[in-house]
Amino acid sequence: ILSLSLLRADDWPTYRHDSRRSGVSAGTLDFPLSESWKVEGGHPRQAWGGPAKWDAYSGNSGLQSMRNFDPCFYVTSADGLVYFGSSRDNSVHALDARTGREQWVFFTEAPVRLPPTIHEGIAFAGSDDGYLYALDARSGAWLWKDRGSPEDRRIPSNAGMISLWPVRTAPLVVGETLFFTASLTPWESSFLIAADPM
């Protein structure tokens, strides 16, 4: 379940608010808080649900989960819209911040585990299909996509197919550079991509 209260202190354009991932806003809240609207989004399909049976790289067994990064639908917000990525329906959603009504949805070929980063009218979202998508933040129209690896190889995962190099990080814009990563297993290469966001 995705439940939000309308708190219009300032925009929250990227995962955990800013490029430092501080999770802190300069805005203030007026108490008591009240629920403005809520959206039933179902439960996320986590990438690594539960403890690890064994570590294929080292051979260790009886491990606890160390990758519990997607137990809920995280949100970003900018210019009157609230955004979230969905591992349940492999998409990016944009909602009206005032009413909670869906404004647009964009589907990818695999789960979207973190919210898009909003920068100068563009929503950047990574997907387990191995691509970073650039979407018009107001309309959801596809602008471009960039594969995070040199080839498009897929493997089975959670009753679906994902890239051997999924984009499981929230994109980050620092200055005029867009950063994202593509990686999954320690025995395959990992990629850090720096790109022009425009």
Predicted regions and their residues:
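Bacterial N-terminal signal peptides
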Residues: 1-5
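Aromatic (tryptophan-biased) beta-strands that constitute blades/sheets of beta-rich domains
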Residues: 10-76, 81-83, 91, 101-108, ...
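Repeat-blade elements of multi-bladed beta-propeller folds
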Residues: 12-16, 63-92, 106-133, 160-193
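A broadly tuned preference for mixed-charge, low-complexity surface segments
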Residues: 31, 130-147, 180-181
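Short, surface-exposed, charge-dense and proline/glycine-enriched linear segments
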Residues: 44, 55-58, 135-136, 175-180
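Glycine-rich active-site/cofactor-binding loop and its immediate structural neighborhood
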Residues: 95-97
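Beta-propeller blade signature
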Residues: 135-136, 140, 190-198
